[in-house]
Amino acid sequence: MIAVRPVTRSDAAEWMRLRRGLWPEEPEDDLDREVAEFFEGTLPEPEAVLLALEGGEAVGVVELAIRPTAEGCRTNRVAYVEAWYVAPGARRSGVGRALIDAAEAWGRSRGCEEIASDTEIANEASARAHRALGFEEAGVVRCFRKQLRSGKDAR
């Protein structure tokens, strides 16, 4: 049976393990700092973190926030899936659905009428999982950045 509940301080190590699975390229120090800041209440988002457990083992996580807007959404208060991860051994067993169902309930309880998410363009497995749970593709976005020069080099 899959249970989904809010993360607690005693879950910090399990949450970190799942975050490292989702973002293996991110420096562990950054991920650790974010978890610490979440429990201190100084991290602006996620606003909520829900952990999925199966047989007492943490097998998935969803990190949530409320955004004033999201691609393709019509309302000005959108529940947003900032992170969604299911451990490889627990995939295709209902864990992802249980997490999104809980995320939807969280959003509704906060007055949201829509829930949104994103994924990397090349992550087809994630896109399929989103579609299977009723998400509709709202657009494809490529993000760009440019370092700003200062002083006499600025133009």
Question: Language-model segments: which ranges?
Answer:
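Conserved active-site alpha-helix within GNAT-family acetyltransferase domains
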Residues: 97, 109, 121-140
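Active-site rim helix/loop that mediates acceptor-substrate recognition in acyltransferases
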Residues: 28-49
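A conserved beta-turn-beta hairpin within the catalytic core of GNAT-like acetyltransferases
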Residues: 68-81, 91, 138-139
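A short beta-loop-alpha structural element at the N-terminal edge
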Residues: 3-17
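Conserved GNAT acetyl-CoA-binding A-motif
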Residues: 107-119
